[in-house]
């Protein structure tokens, strides 16, 4: 098989038994069919193949090297992955459990829509919605969730909401939980409701008795505060109060489900949370609670389904990962010794934000796009000479295989894997969107590579730009736009031009997402970048413009910018008056969260041997205990 033919995720890669239900199996087979991006027999000139003779480019030219650690995942290990949860019996069992959970939802209301229990019925319905979402199984219950939220929303007032429809007053726990869920589902709710939970001095307070209910209420208040919009001062105050209260509570709380929930939200706030990691964590928490306590029947049913769904998707993950490995291997990517090989980590990220079996095309397109970005990143950042990079940039603008004639040998293979893969993914996008979208992607790619060339020229000349000059270019070189645009176009969700304008450049949504990634990435990478001779970063440019400022000053300033941008991005994602519905922006927003997650503690993209490795193990390699 040709070194530059993409290995298709054909029907044989994923059997019926890997799908969580019979209904989804047919849909997934259609999605898998679209991944056949090339056919056996496709070939290219030998000069475009990547081999050890050209990929290392031992040509005597002095080159900068990134000094990154090698691929962490052995070929034999990836090929050996297997799971018993591919058996069709597991999918059948999941279908039965889904039906039983739907009955639980339906038990909260009767035929005419009136709720059956007046004491805590509203809280119970919100609890059900919150739990299926945190457990990663909410896609099965969209109709039931809509019915439940419509019921509860009827009782929302300017002061919030109480536990039940007969509640004489509102309470913080139900209001905070309801506010968060309603906002995330596009209902109009005002944060002013939280003003009614302040004391006479206008401060949030808690009683001296730290009951579990009070701690739970403050915990949900903290979660609600994380989806704040700009200028919502009451949520800023709520976040500060709740964070201080919960940190103090952790000092006295015994190790319990609640304490572990608090720690998780502190570690992974809304803007850097991966739904699959949250599902794994919450499954473990509920499982421990069932051992130490006496769980109700509803919790046990939810937990059983969540575990089963996690493991069924885990089986599908392994098949998709093995197909990606074959694509990566047969393109000759391992021979590019100067780049970071992170296809496993990128797959972990994308399968952490999208667990819908039918979206295999999206997941694989994201990984391939990100791997191409990594090749370009390392080539422009370190390995390529300035003259070589100018030639490559011009060749990308031509977008023709004949453009490789003027390129160095190692660049020819890079160019062809880029050219062929982008074109093939554009064909898949055309099937989904019903129109040619290659023009969008090529423009995004040209802008991305152009920003890299500018940074390479800065390094070559020793030029240190102003903060704003670096920041504006850095939004493009962050890679967020190209990493998002190509994959989302392969989804079955329609993206007509007017909706794409609300997500892609030059929308505020795109600008804020790119800004966050650039700023957060720089706060984690600036020391390593400086060691490689890259003088320009948000940190260094800020210090240059603000004489006498320290690195701590620069980081505080940048972190403040990030906090403001997160609120602006929340608004662009959830605003009720937007032309693009939340469903159209969800994948782009979740990609932003996923990429932010990589930089939660450090540059988990370059240094993938710590938290990122643990993430791979928890969410891709290990099943949960049934």
From Swiss-Prot:
Binding site residues for Mg(2+) 3: 529
Localisation: Plastid, Chloroplast
SUPFAM superfamilies in UniProt: Terpenoid cyclases/Protein prenyltransferases (SSF48239), Terpenoid synthases (SSF48576)
Alphabetized InterPro entries for the sequence: Isoprenoid_synthase_dom_sf (IPR008949), Terpene_cyclase-like_1_C (IPR034741), Terpene_cyclase_plant_C1 (IPR044814), Terpene_synth_N (IPR001906), Terpene_synth_N_sf (IPR036965), Terpene_synthase-like (IPR050148), Terpene_synthase_metal-bd (IPR005630), Terpenoid_cyclase/PrenylTrfase (IPR008930)
Top-rank taxon, per record: Eukaryota
EC number: 4.2.3.107, 4.2.3.113
GO CC annotation terms, alphabetical: chloroplast
Pathway(s) annotated for this protein in UniProt: Terpene metabolism; oleoresin biosynthesis; Secondary metabolite biosynthesis; terpenoid biosynthesis
Enzyme superclass (EC): lyase
GO molecular-function term, one example from the UniProt record: magnesium ion binding
Details of cofactor binding: Binds 3 Mg(2+) or Mn(2+) ions per subunit.
Keywords: Chloroplast, Lyase, Magnesium, Metal-binding, Plastid, Transit peptide
The keyword Membrane appears for this protein: no
Transit peptide: 1-45
Family as reported in the entry's similarity comment: Belongs to the terpene synthase family. Tpsd subfamily.
Domain notes: The Asp-Asp-Xaa-Xaa-Asp/Glu (DDXXD/E) motif is important for the catalytic activity, presumably through binding to Mg(2+).
Stated role: Monoterpene synthase (TPS) involved in the biosynthesis of monoterpene natural products included in conifer oleoresin secretions and volatile emissions; these compounds contribute to biotic and abiotic stress defense against herbivores and pathogens. Catalyzes the conversion of (2E)-geranyl diphosphate (GPP) to (+)-3-carene and, to a lower extent, to terpinolene.
Name of this chain's protein: (+)-3-carene synthase 1, chloroplastic
Species name: Pinus banksiana (Jack pine)
Gene name in the database record: TPS-(+)3car1
């Amino acid at each position: 098989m040709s070194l530059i033919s993409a290995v298709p995720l054909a029907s044989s890669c994923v059997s019926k038994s890997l799908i969580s239900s019979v209904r989804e199996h047919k849909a997934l087979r259609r999605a898998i069919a679209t991944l056949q991006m090339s056919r056996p027999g496709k070939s290219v000139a030998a000069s475009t193949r990547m081999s050890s003779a050209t990929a290392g480019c031992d040509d005597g030219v002095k080159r900068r090297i990134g000094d990154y650690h090698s691929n962490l995942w052995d070929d034999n290990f990836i090929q050996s992955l297997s799971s018993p949860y591919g058996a069709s019996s597991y999918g059948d069992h999941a279908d039965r459990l889904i039906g039983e959970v739907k009955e639980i939802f339906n038990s909260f209301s009767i035929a005419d829509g009136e709720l059956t229990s007046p004491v805590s019925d509203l809280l119970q319905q919100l609890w059900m919605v919150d739990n299926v979402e945190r457990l990663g199984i909410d896609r099965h219950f969209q109709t039931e969730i809509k019915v439940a939220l419509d019921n509860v929303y009827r009782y929302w007032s300017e002061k919030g909401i109480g536990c039940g429809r007969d509640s004489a007053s509102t309470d913080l726990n139900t209001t905070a939980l309801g506010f968060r869920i309603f906002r995330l589902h596009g209902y109009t709710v005002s944060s002013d409701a939280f003003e009614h939970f302040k004391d006479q001095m206008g401060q949030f307070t808690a009683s001296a008795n730290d009951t579990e209910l009070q701690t739970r209420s403050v915990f949900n208040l903290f979660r609600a505060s994380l989806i704040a919009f700009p200028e919502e001062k009451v949520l800023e105050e709520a976040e500060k109060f709740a964070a201080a209260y919960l940190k103090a509570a952790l000092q006295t709380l015994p190790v319990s489900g609640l304490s572990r929930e608090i720690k998780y939200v502190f570690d992974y706030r809304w803007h850097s949370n991966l739904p699959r990691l949250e599902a794994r964590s919450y499954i473990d928490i509920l499982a421990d609670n069932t051992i130490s306590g006496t769980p109700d029947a509803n919790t046990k049913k939810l937990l059983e389904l969540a575990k089963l769904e996690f493991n069924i998707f885990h089986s599908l993950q392994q098949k998709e990962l093995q197909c990606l490995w074959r694509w990566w291997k047969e393109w000759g990517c391992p021979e590019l010794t100067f780049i970071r090989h992170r296809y496993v980590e990128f797959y972990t990220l994308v399968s952490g934000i999208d667990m819908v079996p039918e979206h295999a095309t999206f997941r694989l397109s994201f990984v391939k796009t990100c791997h191409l970005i990594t090749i370009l990143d390392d080539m422009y950042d370190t390995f390529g000479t300035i003259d070589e990079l100018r030639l490559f940039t011009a060749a990308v603008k031509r977008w023709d295989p004949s453009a490789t004639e003027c390129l160095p040998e190692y660049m020819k293979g890079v160019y062809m894997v880029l050219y062929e893969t982008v074109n093939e993914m554009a064909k898949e996008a055309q099937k989904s969107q019903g129109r040619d979208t290659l023009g969008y992607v090529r423009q995004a790619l040209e802008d991305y590579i152009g920003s890299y060339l500018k940074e390479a020229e800065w390094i070559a000349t020793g030029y240190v730009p102003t903060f704003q000059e670096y920041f504006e270019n850095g939004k493009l070189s962050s890679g967020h736009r190209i990493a998002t645009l190509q994959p989302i176009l392969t989804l079955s969700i329609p993206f007509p031009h007017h909706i794409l304008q609300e997500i892609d450049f030059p929308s505020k949504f795109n600008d804020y997402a790119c800004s966050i990634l650039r700023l957060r990435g720089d706060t984690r990478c600036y020391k390593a970048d400086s060691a490689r001779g890259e003088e320009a970063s948000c940190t260094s440019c800020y210090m240059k413009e603000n004489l006498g400022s320290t690195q701590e000053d620069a980081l505080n300033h940048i972190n403040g910018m990030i906090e403001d941008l997160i609120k602006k991005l929340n608004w662009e994602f959830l605003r009720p008056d937007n032309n693009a519905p939340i469903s159209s922006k969800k994948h782009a927003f979740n990609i932003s969260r996923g990429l932010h997650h990589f930089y939660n503690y450090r540059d988990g993209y370059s240094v993938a041997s710590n938290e990122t490795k643990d993430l791979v193990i928890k969410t891709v390699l290990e099943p949960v205990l049934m």
